[in-house]
Design a protein with these regions (language model features):
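A broad, low-specificity signal for short, low-complexity segments enriched in glycine/proline
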Residues: 32, 41, 49-53, 73-77, ...
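Generic detector of contiguous secondary-structure segments
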Residues: 95-110, 115, 257-273
Length: 321
């Protein structure tokens, strides 16, 4: 063995022994309690006190009626859920500076405008998440830690009455997920730069849905003349009802769509994927393969002359059934 190799092995072994010694000292000195009580990513030994002091929370608050949405959030999740009654409500929790309200909202001319006030405590940095060590080094399991860490997420939740029609929904999220349950939008312009879109029982009659980095999952969706664009992420739609011409464009990601029976009977299809396969289960149409360009297509005419689903995927599989 070369002298250099022996030297490096000796140094490595010495560091291992030092690490084991420090671990033993920390363990016998009550280190497990520190790990249990501390956010390892911030190394905050004052348990939750500092985290709580740097957050602003608005409890569920009634707001006047409105017909349109104009939302711009750079670092927050957004939830739209069903109200327990005929009134609308808002609640949120956000990181903040100097305990000031980091979010502003107002209603003018029937439009609810919601935006960050410029004093959020959000910061942007490269983060290596070592918080999983809490489960290994203390009695706290992963599920408990996940529930606890969710207390520190930035979020805004709107509660809307069932069957409320939002005439216009203009929504932008920079870094955050968007969850919708039981919502109806007449015109939409929704854009997510980095986050997932998850909707359960959504109606969108016209407009645009744009996703840069994140998956889109729609359950019981009704779409009209909609343009959906996804740059990097998968698209999953279950029980899709079409009432117009819906166009979907994906750069990188797979598409899986399940149609309801009424849509299957009348809809036309124009499907194409450049690097992937097309599966059209139970649908009648013409399927082609251009081996030179590696392009798969599936086409069929609309039975009612107005309902059509067009999907163009640059790199990904398409499944429609």
């Amino acid at each position: 063995m070369k002298k250099t190799t022996r030297t490096l092995l000796g140094i490595g072994g010495a560091f291992c022994l030092i690490g084991a010694l420090l671990f033993g000292i920390g363990f016998t000195s009550g280190g497990t309690k520190y790990v249990h009580d501390t956010n390892l990513n911030s190394m905050n030994a004052q348990e939750d006190n500092k985290e709580s002091a740097n957050r602003f929370t608005l409890k569920k608050t009634e707001i006047p009626d409105f017909t349109s949405l104009n939302i711009n959030l750079e670092d927050s999740d957004l939830n739209i859920e069903e109200s327990p009654n005929e009134k609308s409500y808002i609640e949120y929790a956000q990181a903040t500076k100097d305990k000031k309200n980091p979010v502003s909202y107002s209603i003018e001319n029937g439009t609810l405008t919601l935006k960050e006030a410029g004093n959020t405590g959000a910061s942007y940095y490269i983060n290596v998440d070592i918080s999983f060590l809490q489960a290994a080094l203390s009695s706290k399991n992963i599920e408990d830690y996940t529930k606890e860490s969710s207390k520190y997420e930035n979020y805004v939740t709107l509660y809307l009455p069932k069957d409320k029609l939002v005439s216009s929904a203009k929504i932008y999220l920079g870094y955050g997920d968007f969850y919708v349950k039981n919502a109806t939008f007449d015109t939409t312009n929704i854009k997510l730069d980095d986050g997932d879109f998850d909707a359960n029982t959504l109606t969108a009659n016209s407009g645009k849905l744009t996703f840069s980095y994140g998956d889109c999952d729609l359950q019981k969706a009704s779409l009209g003349n909609i343009s959906l664009t996804s740059k990097d992420g998968d698209l999953t739609v279950n029980e899709l009802t079409l009432s117009g011409k819906t166009k979907i464009a994906l750069s990188y990601g797979d598409t899986e769509i399940t149609l309801n029976d009424s849509t299957k009977k009348v809809s036309g299809f124009d499907l194409a994927t450049h690097y992937g396969t097309i599966t059209a289960s139970g649908l009648n149409g013409n399927k082609t393969l251009n081996e030179d360009d590696d392009v798969n297509t599936f086409q069929s005419d609309s039975k009612d002359g107005k309902t059509k689903l067009a999907i163009d995927s640059k790199d990904g599989d398409i499944t429609v059934k």
